[in-house]
Amino acid sequence: AIASSLFGDSCRFIRDSGLNVPQSRLVIEKPIGKDKLTAIEINNKIAEVFKENQIYRIDHYLGKETAQNIMVLRFANSIFEPLWRSRFIDHVQITCAEHLGMEGGRGAYYDKAGAARDMVQNHLLQLLSLIAMEPPTDLSANSVRDEKVKVLRTIRGMGPEEVRKNVIRAQYTEGTLGSKTVPSYRDEDRVDPKSMTESYVAMRLFIDNWRWEGTPFYIRMGKRLPTKATEISLHLKSPPNVLFQKLPGSTESNVLTIRIQPDEGMSVRMLSKKPGTTLQNLCCGELSLL
């Protein structure tokens, strides 16, 4: 992989080698810089060589089968669209948990990036955009992009006090994962022993628009966690708890889970009567959709 700081020079070398012809296409992926200013600078350097219609800024998470299925789930099935709003959804969780630490010398890159830059500002915000966007006018890349941008622009901003209330950053410590002893983040190869870079980040976001006003979106990502999974879960609000309020299990709510990896699929958690001759308690069951 080429560091994004070299994108501009690489583009000039391509041009000087005579390889930039009208049918040429440039494919780039994150990280594009380390902040807004460096991202603008890199994009400007690329634009000196390539036209916008030659440039493809990609996110490989969007190539995952279940991620591609989100728009179909939402907009091709009338059972979901009426419920897909703050009136019925209590909160949304987007989780990416990884077993891996800094294997393969990845510490040199990761210690300069961290969990937020490495995963949240690209992969997880892409998933959030697919969950929260309005229906595009068509399935063209520009139309889908425009609706995603609307979502990102309506994410509520945070000042220092809001960050303290809504964001957590952490590092993993020495411990065991399965039967293997693993070092702390600061003891990993090619990581600064005094590093303040986060290997775990969690945040609560709000989208200030008509559909999602008041519904929190919880995003979390971490390394060296006991479970390896990337998934989205939409927790629906519970119905008025009148009929079954005295029964065990009645406080559970319906949850739609979209599993991105490793086991792709979708399921709905639903309540039902526990088998038996009397109505003693309720139990949760998973209805697989995909």
Regions picked out by a protein language model, each given a short descriptive name:
Residues 1-28, 32-290:
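Secretory/organelle targeting and membrane-embedding segments
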